């Protein structure tokens, strides 16, 4: 990537827009591709993304575009902020244009049919591309408002990590590197499920003890699952694990938290998602995670409980009683204690 080349951001949502602005602040020309010509024109004219990031000025160095072919041909570094359901359809026709380029996934989701993470799908679509992920406790609005923020870029490709750090690292945004791409990405996807539970707990005024218990047991549960799939447990003690889990389970700005809060207020799942007006990846992740956990025989009582409420007709009180009456397990069972006194 030369200094003259623009950087691409694929996706017109809140996070894609926040990252596009960060890149622009760091001196890059940015091509932000989106499917909706009306949205692109609105941003072009008003310098604001009113649908997803109202009140935040989009910098003049960010050019909203709708020609994906020209965008991919012009850029070597491409940030992919597309919904998980759209990834294959958008990128599959452009394999030749993506060969050898750096593709960095910003999407925290899991494909329903295959249980593949977004970077794994990118790898499948474009085997010759250089793949990375960006994940961490990163609420889009706070990034856009310049709240002090840290994130993790993960890839086996050290040079890619360095390129992303150079592109994004700034006065309010700190970028750490990791070679555990799978663990970093899995943490970002799994925590969305627990944010729904946390939002429900707050809406029902369950108290601080309960919220703390839920977040801590969620960390144990998601790490237990991730380790069973080959992830490094230490990844989950960092920004992409416990860091992301805390912010997503604590903030009303989190989309999945908002869905959970609406459910706790008595709305149906359909009404909660409609009220949000954006994709809440946690709902889709819950479905596939429940099946996968059963398949690999990993104990995930919070996942099973939320699934029972949303899709099996169980009441919240029934699930809470079952969870509290279950046999207590070991507190921290996902990290080997070998070598410790």
Swiss-Prot record:
Q: What's the stated role of this polypeptide?
A: Catalyzes the reduction of the glycolytic intermediate dihydroxyacetone phosphate (DHAP) to sn-glycerol 3-phosphate (G3P), the key precursor for phospholipid synthesis.
Query: What GO terms in the biological process aspect are recorded for it?
Result: carbohydrate metabolic process; glycerol-3-phosphate biosynthetic process; glycerol-3-phosphate catabolic process; glycerophospholipid biosynthetic process
What the record says about family reads: Belongs to the NAD-dependent glycerol-3-phosphate dehydrogenase family.
Positions bound to sn-glycerol 3-phosphate? 108, 136, 191, 244, 254-256
Q: What class of enzyme is it?
A: oxidoreductase
EC number(s) per entry: 1.1.1.94
InterPro entries according to UniProt:
6-PGluconate_DH-like_C_sf (IPR008927), 6PGD_dom2 (IPR013328), G3P_DH_NAD-dep (IPR006168), G3P_DH_NAD-dep_C (IPR006109), G3P_DH_NAD-dep_N (IPR011128), NAD(P)-bd_dom_sf (IPR036291)
| PANTHER family xrefs | GLYCEROL-3-PHOSPHATE DEHYDROGENASE, GLYCEROL-3-PHOSPHATE DEHYDROGENASE [NAD(+)] 2, CHLOROPLASTIC
Q: Which residues form the active site?
A: 191 (proton acceptor)
Tell me the Pfam families matching this sequence: NAD_Gly3P_dh_C (PF07479), NAD_Gly3P_dh_N (PF01210)
- CC per GO annotation: cytosol
User: Which subcellular locations apply to this protein?
Assistant: Cytoplasm
Q: What is this protein called?
A: Glycerol-3-phosphate dehydrogenase [NAD(P)+]
Which GO molecular function terms does the record list?
glycerol-3-phosphate dehydrogenase [NAD(P)+] activity; NAD binding
Determine if Ribosomal protein is one of this entry's keywords: no
So, what pathway does this thing act in? Membrane lipid metabolism; glycerophospholipid metabolism
Binding annotation for NADPH:
14-15, 35, 108, 140, 255, 279, 281
Q: Which reaction does it catalyse?
A: sn-glycerol 3-phosphate + NAD(+) = dihydroxyacetone phosphate + NADH + H(+); sn-glycerol 3-phosphate + NADP(+) = dihydroxyacetone phosphate + NADPH + H(+)
Q: Entry's HAMAP family?
A: NAD_Glyc3P_dehydrog
Whose protein is this, by species? Pseudomonas savastanoi pv. phaseolicola (strain 1448A / Race 6)
Gene3D superfamilies listed in its UniProt record: N-(1-d-carboxylethyl)-l-norvaline Dehydrogenase, domain 2, NAD(P)-binding Rossmann-like Domain
Kindly state which keywords UniProt assigns to this record, in alphabetical order: Cytoplasm, Lipid biosynthesis, Lipid metabolism, NAD, NADP, Nucleotide-binding, Oxidoreductase, Phospholipid biosynthesis, Phospholipid metabolism
């Amino acid at each position: 990537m030369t200094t003259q080349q623009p950087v691409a951001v694929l996706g017109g949502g809140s996070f894609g827009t926040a990252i596009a602005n960060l890149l622009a602040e760091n001196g890059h020309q940015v091509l932000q591709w989106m499917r909706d010509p009306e949205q692109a024109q609105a941003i072009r004219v008003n310098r604001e993304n009113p649908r997803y990031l109202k009140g935040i000025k989009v910098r003049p160095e960010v050019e909203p575009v709708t020609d994906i072919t020209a965008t991919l041909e012009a850029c070597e570094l491409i940030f992919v902020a597309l919904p998980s359901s759209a990834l294959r359809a958008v990128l599959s026709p452009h394999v030749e244009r993506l060969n050898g380029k750096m593709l960095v996934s910003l999407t925290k989701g899991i494909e329903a049919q295959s249980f593949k993470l977004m970077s794994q799908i990118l790898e499948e679509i474009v085997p010759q591309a250089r793949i990375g992920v960006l994940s961490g406790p990163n609420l889009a609005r706070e990034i856009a408002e310049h709240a002090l923020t840290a994130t993790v870029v993960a890839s086996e490709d050290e040079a890619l990590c360095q390129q992303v750090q150079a592109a994004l690292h700034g006065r309010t945004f700190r970028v750490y590197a990791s070679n555990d791409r799978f663990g970093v990405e899995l943490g970002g996807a799994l925590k969305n499920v627990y944010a729904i539970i946390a939002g429900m707990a707050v809406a029902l005024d369950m108290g601080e003890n309960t919220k703390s218990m839920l977040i801590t047991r969620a960390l144990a549960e998601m790490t237990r699952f991730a380790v069973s799939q080959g992830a490094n447990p230490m990844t989950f003690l960092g920004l992409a694990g416990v860091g992301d889990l805390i912010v997503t389970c604590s903030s009303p700005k989190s989309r999945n938290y908002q869905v959970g809060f609406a459910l706790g207020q008595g709305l149906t799942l359909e009404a909660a998602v409609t009220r949000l007006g954006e994709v809440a990846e946690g709902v889709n992740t819950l479905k596939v995670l429940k099946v996968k956990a059963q398949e690999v025989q990993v104990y995930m009582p919070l996942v099973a409980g939320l699934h029972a409420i949303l899709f099996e007709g169980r009441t919240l009180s029934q699930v809470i009683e079952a969870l509290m009456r279950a046999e207590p397990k070991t507190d921290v069972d996902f990290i080997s204690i070998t070598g410790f006194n």
